[in-house]
Amino acid sequence: ADDSDPVGGEFLAEGGGVR
C-alpha cells in the first residue's frame, strides 16, 4: 500500500491506500 490516501482499507496496517 501507499502512504498517500487512506483508501482501500490497507491504510490501517500499511499506512496508506492501496490505490
Swiss-Prot record:
Subcellular location: Secreted
Post-translational modification: Conversion of fibrinogen to fibrin is triggered by thrombin, which cleaves fibrinopeptides A and B from alpha and beta chains, and thus exposes the N-terminal polymerization sites responsible for the formation of the soft clot. The soft clot is converted into the hard clot by factor XIIIA which catalyzes the epsilon-(gamma-glutamyl)lysine cross-linking between gamma chains (stronger) and between alpha chains (weaker) of different monomers. Forms F13A-mediated cross-links between a glutamine and the epsilon-amino group of a lysine residue, forming fibronectin-fibrinogen heteropolymers.
Disulfide bonds: none
GO biological process, one term: innate immune response
Signal sequence, renumbered to the chain: none
Example of a GO cellular component annotation carried by this entry: extracellular region
Annotated coiled-coil segments of the chain: none
The entry's keywords: Adaptive immunity, Blood coagulation, Coiled coil, Disulfide bond, Hemostasis, Immunity, Innate immunity, Secreted
Domain of life: Eukaryota
Quaternary structure, from the entry: Heterohexamer; disulfide linked. Contains 2 sets of 3 non-identical chains (alpha, beta and gamma). The 2 heterotrimers are in head to head conformation with the N-termini in a small central domain.
Domain notes: A long coiled coil structure formed by 3 polypeptide chains connects the central nodule to the C-terminal domains (distal nodules). The long C-terminal ends of the alpha chains fold back, contributing a fourth strand to the coiled coil structure.
Job description of the protein: Cleaved by the protease thrombin to yield monomers which, together with fibrinogen beta (FGB) and fibrinogen gamma (FGG), polymerize to form an insoluble fibrin matrix. Fibrin has a major function in hemostasis as one of the primary components of blood clots. In addition, functions during the early stages of wound repair to stabilize the lesion and guide cell migration during re-epithelialization. Was originally thought to be essential for platelet aggregation, based on in vitro studies using anticoagulated blood.
Name this protein carries in UniProt: Fibrinogen alpha chain
Source organism (scientific name): Ovis aries (Sheep)
Organism phylogeny: Eukaryota, Metazoa, Chordata, Craniata, Vertebrata
Gene for this chain: FGA
